[in-house]
Amino acid sequence: SKAIRFPILIFGKVTIKNVRKGRLVFNCPLTTGILQIGKRSLGFLDKHNCRTIWNVAGTLYVHGKASIGQGCCVEVEKDAVMTLGRNFNVTGRSVLLCTEQITFGDDCLLSWDLLIMDTDWHKVISTTDGGILNPSKPINIGSHVWIGCRSLILKGVNISDNVIVAANSTISRNIDEEFVVV
């Protein structure tokens, strides 16, 4: 007989939006808790007042075990794509905003209070031709990447495999070298 599996586990205060509009695709064997949303991993977060937000109107691919910590906001806009590699972990109170494409490789560890966004969240319009001067740009974060607390990853960034991003960093350019600490 086939056992019932619960691939998604939800912890604490979680707001889920766009359930019928968005797509969640598991590109891995389904096991219980392969995706954990709102899990408390930081003792200093207030478990009574810290809400996790899951707002996926686009497509989110999960390639293996993934954990979205307490107080995080995951937002994938309509027609946008976010990909989480195997063993993805964001600890808490971080914001992942995707309007086009954000890709995380395998074994990514993201600390708390991060902001990762592929957009400026506003448009700058050319006065000469009416075109958008600041379009969204994809973000690609390689495998075995560790991003320290209170860091900011901006649109258009590519981070190679095996990189450590130090706490309080702002990454606005590509990190092409492997095995570096930024």
Spans of features found by a protein language model:
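Short, highly charged low-complexity linear segments
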Residues: 126-129, 172-173
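C-terminal/domain-terminus segments
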Residues: 158-182
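C-terminal segments of enzyme domains that contribute to small-molecule binding surfaces
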Residues: 128-155, 179-180
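Short acidic/His/Gly/Ser-rich catalytic and metal-binding motifs that mark active-site loops
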Residues: 118-126
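Short, flexible, glycine/charge-rich loop motifs used to bind or transfer phosphoryl groups or to couple energy/partner
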Residues: 56-57, 79, 135-136, 170-171
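Short coil-to-beta-strand initiation/turn motif
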Residues: 72, 153, 169-171
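Domain-scale signature associated with acetyltransferase and cell-envelope carbohydrate enzymes
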Residues: 1-117, 142-144, 151, 161, ...
